[in-house]
Amino acid sequence: MKIIEAVNIRYTYPDGTEALKGIDFHAKKGEVVALLGPNGAGKSTLFLHFNGILQPTSGKVLVDGKEIDYSKSGLIKVRQKVGIVFQNPDDQLFAPRVDEDVAFGPLNMGLDEDEVEERVKDALRKVGMSGYEDRPPHHLSGGEKKRVAIAGILAMKPDIMILDEPTSGLDPRGASQILRLLHELNEEGMTIIISTHDVDLAPLYSDRIYIISGGEIISEGTPGDVFSDIDTIRGADLRLPRIAHLVEILQKEDDLPFGEPYPLTIGEARRKLRDQLK
């Protein structure tokens, strides 16, 4: 079942810039979907359509099979189902204390204080930030801020979480913690949609991948399908995952017969190497 869908959406900014050019996109319930593209391709603009922050110039966005209602009450309902975590957590965190920031969404849903308190406690526990309730967000590290921003969305209990460049600006440990958290949330049934230009990350965590370039979707499919079209990947100013690129070089320049498609992860490469050595 398609839990969220964009149908032929176009978007033109007030200055006349056409940012999206007939985008078709969907995610099924329980999927992890990656939107892969270079900077300026339209990833963030597309995401802002998914909970009604932006309204398409033409086309439509559907959540649970229903077109978004852009009235105030309609948007409140959509944002209870679809949560967006911005690339820069400083754009999202504004309250003087962590617990107040996480409580903002549930309070605006009209929940009573006991329910809000329970949701804040549970969300901070899930992201590993229990004990930080009274800390000022601006005193936190980049990874901690990102986790608090995710907690603020979790506290609203959405069905879909959308994250714009979730590992941007994080060191390897911080990035790993965020990705592990997203995997756990997906295991609990949440649909996860991420944007990234990190081609090494996408095959590890995604069920399906979309490639966006110049405001258009130019490829869609499983990681294996998408990365097997090398010309399209490089034509979008992206590259192969490091493992796949290494295998490409070994096969073309050193005559090692790996075959195609190229492995995309260390695990896949290890299995292919073991097969070669048998």
From Swiss-Prot:
Q: Which InterPro entries match?
A: AAA+_ATPase (IPR003593), ABC_transporter-like_ATP-bd (IPR003439), ABC_transporter-like_CS (IPR017871), ABC_transpr_CbiO/EcfA_su (IPR015856), Co_trans_ATP-bd (IPR005876), ECF_ABC_transporter_ATP-bd (IPR050095), P-loop_NTPase (IPR027417)
Does the keyword section mention Methyltransferase?
no
Query: Keywords for this entry?
Result: ATP-binding, Cell membrane, Membrane, Nucleotide-binding, Translocase, Transport
> Which CDD domains does this entry report, sorted A to Z?
ABC_cobalt_CbiO_domain1 (cd03225)
Q: What is its EC number?
A: 7.-.-.-
Q: Specify the domain of life of the species encoding this protein.
A: Archaea
The principal localisation class reads: membrane
GO MF entries: ATP binding; ATP hydrolysis activity; ATPase-coupled transmembrane transporter activity
Kindly indicate whether the keyword Cell membrane belongs to this entry: yes
Cell compartments where the protein resides:
Cell membrane
Q: Which SMART domains match?
A: AAA
The UniProt annotation places ATP binding at G37, P38, N39, G40, A41, G42, K43, S44
**GO biological process, any:** cobalt ion transport
Q: Name one GO cellular component term.
A: ATP-binding cassette (ABC) transporter complex
User: What's its job?
Assistant: Probably part of an ABC transporter complex. Responsible for energy coupling to the transport system.
List the NCBIfam families hit by this protein, alphabetically.
cbiO
Q: Per its record, how is this protein called by name?
A: Putative ABC transporter ATP-binding protein MTBMA_c05830
